[in-house]
Amino acid sequence: MAKGKDILQHPYIKVGRLKMNVAKAAHLKCADIVVSQNYLKHIEKKHSTELKTLGIDSYSYVKLIVDNYNQIRQGSDDSVLLVIFRDGNHHDVAAIKLTYITSKDVWEVKTAQPRNSKDVLKRKLLW
């Protein structure tokens, strides 16, 4: 795992990259995707039940989405959502919220969670 410091000087981990072809198609910046230790702790705390059900930790959940997303949707404000969309139960979407940090040229993970597809489908599809 690539480690460094985020803009608040907290350790962060590179979890992937928004690839050039996808970024171009979605009109987004091609850049590394990073997550801070603080956000991993936040995800673990807020979504421990879901993570235990899946049998994975917060890092593995974020990495799973970064490696397997099949949609990008507009998030709130300037954020975007990387989404694994699949049919099934109430929580049939896995999503991470990313915000682009211009000064560091990275996409930072702000949260990751299972979501109801109805909420996600209301968001503009970018890719």
Predicted regions and their residues:
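Ribonuclease/tRNase effector modules and their secretory precursors
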Residues: 1-127
